[in-house]
Amino acid sequence: NVTSTYSNGCGIFDISFCSATKYFSGHSDAMGGSLAVNQKVYKKIMFFYKLSGYRMSADEAYLIIRGLRTLDTRLKQHYENTKIIINFLKKQKKIKEILYPHNPSSKNYKLWKKYYSGATGLFSIVIKSKKKSSVISFVNSLELFGIGYSWGGFESLAILQEIKSAKKDEYLKGRQFYRFNKDEFIVRLH
């Protein structure tokens, strides 16, 4: 839910990478990514970089640089719009939970605050419903949101996320994974 703009990745990790396809370009018309490394791994990464031949095309670079010029303004507006939508959704009976770590009522707010300085417009809602078809109808009826997976572009999108199973994994080291009941559905919004 954040871009590298709001995180201090290299202050925490040796390698930080992110998609430049989403918020960086801002128009959903370019594909690329960024990689930032600290001095500890720089030589290894540069060796692989030279060996692999991976390069971004000039057109993709141009489109992403164009988007970077307005990134800060767009992210601030995404966040402001998201606050308005979340405040509206909090009052809806069918909404069980809003999954957005920047929200002070979020279970993960303290953890988010420790590592990030801002937020974007991507969040999910947990809808309580006896029928999946009702949730599909809800998503299809949205007038200001298109249907799709991408985010960070110029349009608002929504998609019903299919949750097959959610279980505790070893790598979580005791942290609680979200548990969903049969009558709960996730809709991702941007």
Predicted regions mapped to residue ranges:
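Conserved residues at beta->alpha junctions
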Residues: 36-39, 129, 190
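Conserved PLP-enzyme active-site core in the AAT-like
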Residues: 1-94, 99
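Conserved C-terminal alpha-helix-loop-beta "cap" of PLP-dependent enzymes
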Residues: 97-188
